[in-house]
């Protein structure tokens, strides 16, 4: 009888120990909001989880404008732990609303100062730069007798009427970096006049920054205003497009990482922020973008000019963030009629 009780006690202790061990090693789940391209996420997640096997990621992905609006709507009851891959202009807005937890990740000293928030510790830390590019379908252009544009000004020529597609800036970070750049480069009056002229040639405004290049690749529209990652990738996949970088300069933004204020998984969130700023992560970002937040990591791309980074405009992120609502309200009032229907 005593032996039976002893065995029962031992079994209970072993069972309890195994349960405790399982609980101790149970994975922490981070809810991560992102506007990263779907074809980038898998590699980023795999590398992070290889280094942090005790942390799982639950992704919430959409275009920049949608993710930003969702985060703002959840301000009183945040659902995200971390933001990994969202425009710096959006993160600056969230920071102004007091929605981010400042954190200095390991490796911060290697980050170029212009690719992180100015605060110490920073509210957000950059990953990579994405910038304007035009996807030009050479086959369709030849069929339709369309000359190759080389500048933003060229896109207002009557020959391109109905031939151009671009992202809606209220939905797409790519769309907003274009609109913001035109207003900064040309000034408000001339910038809106430019967009009025461009609007006459727009066939559709999409809710995705990648879609215009995809539409150009298939010939649905011969010209798509997109961004260099999608343009270069699409051409390398064999699409009959030329990648055009307009001569006046390129609008751009920074994909960045930030910790959401109020997260219940702060230590795990810090580990993700550490990884995002690491050399290993930069090596992943470099596979997709010509400019990353740590100088000297990115390698030249044969489809982009050697002076690519110098073609980026002098971008005032504070202005772009502070004036975002006003700009989008005015843009929607003028041009929303040509936007595709939301799914």
Regions found by a protein language model. Name each.
Residues 35, 39-42, 79-220:
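Extracytoplasmic ligand-binding site segments that recognize negatively charged/polar headgroups
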Residues 135-140, 180-183, 253-265, 284-285:
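A bilobed periplasmic-binding-protein/Venus flytrap-type ligand-binding module shared by bacterial periplasmic
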Residues 89-93, 217, 221-240, 289:
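A ligand-binding cleft/hinge motif common to bilobed small-molecule-binding domains
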Residues 27-93:
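Early extracytoplasmic/lumenal segment of secretory-pathway proteins
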Residues 188-190, 291-343:
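An extracytoplasmic/periplasmic, membrane-proximal ligand-sensing/linker region
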Residues 110-113, 159-167, 194-199, 205-206, 237-261, 276-298, ...:
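Periplasmic-binding protein-like
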Residues 20-26:
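Sec/Tat signal peptide C-region and signal peptidase I cleavage site
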